[in-house]
């Protein structure tokens, strides 16, 4: 499998998807980690705020879209060009991270939780897309390496995003840095998504997606 990895990482059939997925997973965890530190330390210092409850609430808010929209996301991937959906999702991510940046700048927990829900929805929609795109653009003997790279990249992005988000929040103006970095990463993810080759739906007879 090792011999198949490097050609894939240099191929337009795979590299833009890998970069897009990596940056999306990084942003998810950058914001989650930054929010956890913000709530735990900054708001707890002010008193009257149950930081532990807010952190648990944040986790639930991020996960909720997976339960609410997973079915619709899978159906959408069968009806619309998957590469186009990826681009739409990445445009949405820019606005989501801008909301998060505003939440950090204004020290607004509601805005941060709204951004977190948006990122959960972003991940819910993009999840089926990334796996559906692999067999569209890779030949059969490349699929194992492609899936392995996506999984490895995702876990690495989670690790880096979690560590960096927590670390940056502890420096001067860390919240602003996290917010600006999140928007910059979202912009980069959108640019990489534009290079994903088109993948039109194979069937136009799939039922319209339902939210739940």
Task: Describe these PLM feature segments.
Residues 1-212:
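Alpha-helical transmembrane-bundle signature of multi-pass membrane transport and export proteins
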């Amino acid at each position: 499998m090792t011999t198949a990895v490097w050609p894939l990482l240099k191929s337009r059939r795979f590299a833009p998807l890998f970069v897009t997925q990596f940056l999306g997973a990084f942003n998810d965890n950058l914001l989650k980690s930054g929010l956890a530190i913000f709530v735990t330390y900054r708001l707890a210092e002010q008193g009257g705020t149950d930081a532990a409850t807010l952190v648990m609430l944040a986790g639930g808010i991020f996960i909720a879209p997976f339960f609410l929209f997973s079915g619709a996301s899978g159906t959408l991937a069968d009806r619309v060009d998957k590469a186009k959906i990826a681009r739409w999702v990445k445009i949405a991510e820019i606005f989501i991270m801008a909301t998060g940046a505003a939440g950090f700048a204004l020290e607004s927990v509601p805005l941060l939780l709204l951004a977190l829900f948006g990122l959960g929805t972003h991940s819910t929609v993009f999840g089926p897309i990334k796996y559906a795109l692999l067999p569209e653009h890779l030949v059969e003997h490349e699929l194992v390496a492609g899936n392995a790279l996506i999984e490895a990249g995702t876990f690495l992005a989670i690790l880096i995003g979690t560590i960096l988000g927590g670390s940056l929040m502890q420096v001067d103006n860390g919240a602003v840095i996290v917010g600006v970095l999140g928007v910059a990463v979202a912009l980069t993810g959108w640019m990489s998504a534009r290079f994903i080759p088109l993948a039109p739906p194979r069937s136009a007879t799939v039922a319209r997606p339902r939210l739940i």
